[in-house]
Curated annotation (Swiss-Prot):
This is UPF0182 protein alr1037. It comes from the Bacteria. It is found in: Cell membrane. Its main location: membrane. It comes from Nostoc sp. (strain PCC 7120 / SAG 25.82 / UTEX 2576).
Length: 1002
């Protein structure tokens, strides 16, 4: 009795704990979303998820438990079974008592069948049949359980998880093969099957409960697909096979596939569970015989079988549309075999499945125990399975190998063209402006001076060496860290931009110069990394009350070098002359770049939650041998206030010291979810986000509140899909992507705003309809921030990867892969690696002004010469435009690998690099940049020197290559001067004829 009460109290305690935990999560989320201004977004998602879970779990539970309860009523009672079988056994001879004996005749079977009963099953048939059905039940549980676990522990956005293939007749074998190839799953499924055979009633009901939770979970996490279905936006473009608008495949088909996944599993398990209930009734296994299905049992199974066949027909109806994702042919999407053979087969299977389903349901409604057409059901199902196997799998394979492959190009030409066209549409490649670029090799010193802005922005400092230098010179304390350095451009007053001449022989500046100039810079945030705090100092107060924020940033021009080969800084240090402000290189920089009080409460590595406005002052920044302290006065955070809120957040954060600390005040706030990625992920989980948030120093008013705070994070967000018809997916399974959203996060206040960057994207239009007011037009972004938007690296990388194949628009060239491209390699440090896209300020060919672009060169497959380069524009009206410059194929244009080889083969350069590498240091070859200037290409590579003991990279040399000339000098200016200096032609020798026989005297 005592233990029973202990068990009950434990159950009550666990239930109360779960209830409190759920309530605290819900309450904290409501407070947090209200703080960031997106409470309506959260509530709509919450209601949608809750309704979907309740509907899916409830319908599944009612259907499965209801049918299992009905089966319990209709199954053979134990007493009837024992009496009948034992009476018949008593009449048998001793030699016939073994039901497995081949001498046992059917005439000796139990006489309990009336005219409506089906024939009995003996043990040699009953046991394998029951075991196979039990294995199927275990396979269903494991399969759908794996899907649910994939949603619980995703590696990417939950809403973007693909719908895994449901239980279709032709795929059960493949699913079984995959699962049974793994010993763990094999043992689990066999164990479930044996448990069902022994304790059928308990385990069949338990599996029904688990599947109800699983199906509820699957629909819970697919709330985005459901909402998109009800708010579709037309693409105004049709796919060629069925003539449907693309929106059907993006918004409608995923929901139908989700329903198929759910209902197919529910109906299939229900049919299997009820069949097992009947087969295992009356202790049939221990008695060695099943008396046969009674008329009531048959009627029940007919009804459930009819629903199952209805889903099978629906599955084949969906399979027709899924042919546009077929990988069978030479190109992605429906191929010749799919259209000519597979599509008619799916149509036939759909119609036959409907016919069988309607017949079974008609027999269920208008039941007759004695029917002369009863055997037609088995014939029909047998014929259906034959068509599925023979026509659904064998026939398409025969056609593919015997008809298509011998004449593949002729058969597949139309379908290849579809793949090319729709892949280019899906990845935004059809709008690329392709031009011819024919390098002339006539670049002169005058041309270099005419392109002074381009030269002044050639990037000599890469992110890696600059970050290493920052960590040595600008961190100041162990708990500060520079997690990243980002390329951007700023408009500076001319005084700030004119610290260094572009070349040694540059003419003096004219009397009238431009008031401002754009400079390419590397900006890095100085964030607080609490994990770097000494272990002895990692106390609760330090973690949550004192070490709350980072401070400041560094800004370095990309092309200038300070004393000793170290980078120069426009902005650096902490605690300048203006009470905690940062140090600047000049007044012009201070006037050009707003600094204010650059506290970073929200950043890339701010992963701890903190409490502000307490009795404990926050560490602001180090000042000499002491520290400066401050209290947060921003708009972020949630007021803890009363005791119940303190308890709520203590429960939510699992931080019980919050309940007992005496440092809280009535105005104390809690700031959590401070990492910018997790912050925007929580608000908009239906978007994908760029991997590189970048810091911007600008005046964001009036869109962002807050005085004297000018630091913002900008993040690019993408709308993606894997359901675009005929579009060949990339390595991540994405076959549609748009950079539709720009996100701005206030680094001090935590405010988040979403701006639509591509209003032509139907997916973002759908999300705008679902969440009205969440997205703002890009024109609402402050101009000071808008001037810093850039073409995102991740988006450009995906497009450039697809372009390597899908620049070929001719079907025969595409089929033969005659013009396949690749991304060239470069040497970085001492290792070869693919060239990464890089930003630069330059003027594109035929464009009369400089602009901020993202560039990537291409080489032909398995060759090293340049074949093209892709440029993405980032400024003003030209933002988002792609330009592809193709080089003449009949002319050699040096690629990065060829230039690297020439650098390493040059005796002077290679000797110097080898000398550095032998003196306790290491020479690092930086990024090799291919820079278009007018109608020529200039190659620039910095060389850094790094000590093996102390990693402080310094820029020691710059290598410049142009045409057949290559120069290594201490500065870019010297290298340019050397490579473009006029070649001195020696004076011809004076040759006089010497006449034989003459002498000076003569």
């Amino acid at each position: 009795m005592f233990w029973k009460w202990c068990f009950r109290l434990s159950i009550v305690f666990v239930g109360l704990w779960l209830l409190l935990d759920l309530s605290s999560r819900l309450g904290a989320e409501v407070f947090w979303f209200r703080e960031v201004g997106y409470l309506q977004v959260f509530l709509l998602r919450l209601v949608s998820r809750g309704v979907l879970w309740v509907v899916a779990a409830g319908v599944t539970a009612v259907y499965l438990w209801g049918n299992l309860a009905l089966a319990q009523r209709l199954k053979y009672p134990r007493s009837l079974k024992i009496a009948e079988v034992r009476r018949e056994e008593a009449e048998l001879s001793v030699g016939l008592k073994n039901f497995l004996s081949p001498q046992y005749s059917r005439l000796n079977a139990p006489k309990i069948n009336d005219a409506g009963h089906l024939k009995p099953f003996r043990l040699r048939w009953l046991l394998p049949l029951a075991f196979v059905f039990s294995l199927l039940a275990g396979l269903i549980l494991v399969h759908y359980g794996k899907i649910a676990l994939a949603y619980w522990y995703p590696a990417f956005n939950k809403n973007s998880l693909p719908i895994i293939t449901p239980f279709r007749l032709e795929t059960i074998w493949e699913l079984g093969r995959q699962v049974f190839s793994q010993v763990l799953y094999l043992g689990l499924i066999v164990g479930i099957a044996i448990a069902i055979l022994i304790y059928s009633q308990f385990f069949l009901r338990a599996i029904a409960v688990v599947l109800s939770v699983v199906f509820g979970t699957i629909l819970f996490y697919n709330w985005a697909k459901v909402l998109q279905y009800f708010f579709p936006t037309p693409f105004n473009s049709t796919e060629p096979l069925f003539g449907k608008d693309i929106s059907f495949y993006i918004f409608s088909l995923p929901l139908w596939e989700l329903l198929e996944l759910w209902l197919m599993g529910m109906f299939l398990y229900g049919f299997i569970a009820v069949t097992l209930t009947y087969l295992l009734s009356a202790d049939s296994l221990s008695q060695g015989i099943f008396p046969g299905f009674s008329p009531q049992q048959q009627r029940h199974l007919y009804g459930m079988g009819g629903l199952l066949m209805l889903m099978v027909a629906f599955s084949y109806w969906l399979s027709r549309y899924e042919l546009v994702y077929s990988p069978r042919g030479v190109s992605y999407g429906a191929s010749y075999t799919d259209v000519v053979v597979q599509l008619p087969i799916y149509n036939i299977l759909c119609v036959l499945g409907l016919a069988i389903a309607f017949y079974l349901l008609w027999r269920t409604i208008f039941w007759r125990a004695k029917s002369q057409y009863r055997q037609f059901v088995f014939y029909g199902l047998g014929a259906y399975l034959f068509v599925v196997v023979a026509a659904g799998s064998v026939l398409p394979t025969i056609v593919q190998y015997l008809i298509v492959q011998p004449n593949e190009l002729q058969r597949e030409q139309t379908y290849i063209q579809r793949t090319i066209a729709l892949t280019r549409q899906a990845f935004g490649l059809e709008t690329i402006d392709a031009r011819t670029f024919n390098p002339q090799g006539d670049l002169t010193t005058a041309a270099i001076q005419a392109n002074d802005l381009t030269i002044r922005n050639i990037r000599l400092w890469d992110q890696r060496p600059l970050l290493e230098t920052n960590r040595q010179l600008q961190q100041f304390r162990p708990y500060y860290r520079f997690p990243d350095a980002d390329i951007d451009r700023y408009t500076l007053e001319a005084e700030a931009a004119a610290n260094r001449p572009a070349s040694a022989n540059q003419s003096p500046a004219p009397a009238e110069i431009a008031a401002t100039e754009r400079r390419q810079v590397l900006i890095a945030a100085r964030e607080l990394d609490y994990s770097a705090v000494p272990e002895q100092a990692q106390t609760w107060i330090n973690q949550h009350l004192i070490y709350t924020h980072g401070y400041g940033f560094t800004m370095s021009p990309v092309n200038t070098v300070g004393p000793g080969g170290l980078p120069e800084y426009f902005v650096k240090d902490i605690a300048g002359s203006n009470e905690g402000a940062l140090s600047t290189s000049s007044e012009a920089v201070r006037d050009s770049i707003p600094i204010g009080q650059p506290r970073i409460y929200y950043g890339e590595i701010t992963n701890t939650y903190v409490m502000t406005g307490t009795r404990v002052r926050e560490l602001d920044y180090p000042s000499g041998s002491d520290n400066a302290y401050n209290s947060y006065s921003g708009l972020g955070g949630i007021v803890i206030g009363s005791g119940w809120r303190k308890g709520l957040f203590a429960m939510y954060l699992k931080d019980w010291q919050m309940l007992f600390t005496r440092d809280f005040l009535p105005e104390t706030k809690v700031l959590f979810r401070r990492n910018v990625k997790s912050r925007i992920q929580a608000i908009a989980p239906f978007l994908k986000f760029d991997s590189d948030p970048y810091l911007v120093s600008a005046d964001g008013s009036p869109a962002f509140s807050g005085r004297d705070n000018y630091l913002y994070w900008m993040v690019d967000a993408y709308t993606t899909s894997d359901r675009y018809p005929y579009s060949d997916p990339d390595n991540n399974g994405i076959n549609y992507i748009r950079n539709s959203v720009k996100i701005v996060i206030d680094a001090y206040n935590g405010s988040v705003k979403f701006y639509i960057a591509d209003p032509t994207d139907p997916i973002i239009a759908t999300w705008s309809a679902i969440f009205p007011g969440m997205f703002q037009p890009l024109s609402d972004m402050p101009v000071t921030l808008r001037s810093h938007i850039r073409y995102p690296l991740d988006y450009f990388a995906i497009q450039s990867e697809r372009l390597m194949t899908y620049h070929m628009t001719d079907t025969q060239v595409f089929y033969n892969r005659e013009d396949q491209w690749q991304i060239p390699n470069e040497i970085y440090g001492s290792e070869s690696r693919p060239v990464e896209p890089y930003y630069l300020i330059t003027s594109l060919p035929t464009v009369p002004f400089e602009e901020f672009i993202l560039l990537l060169p291409y080489t032909p497959k398995q060759r090293t010469n340049l074949i093209a380069w892709l440029a993405a524009r980032s400024d003003g009206e030209n933002y988002g435009k792609l330009l592809l410059y193709n080089f003449p194929k009949e002319r050699l244009v040096y690629g990065t690998e060829q230039i690297e080889a020439r650098i390493n083969q040059d005796p002077v350069i290679s000797q110097q690099i080898s000398l550095w590498n032998r003196q306790g240091s290491r020479a690092i070859q930086g990024n090799l940049l291919v820079i278009p200037i007018e109608q020529s290409l200039l190659y620039v590579e910095p060389i850094y020197l790094e000590a093996t003991q102390n990693s402080l990279p310094t820029l020691v040399r710059v290598v410049v290559a142009y045409e057949n000339r290559i120069v290594m000098a201490q500065t870019l200016e010297q290298a340019l001067q050397a490579i473009f200096q006029p070649e001195v032609t020696p004076a011809p020798a004076i040759i006089r004829p010497f006449e034989e026989g003459t002498t000076p005297d003569s």
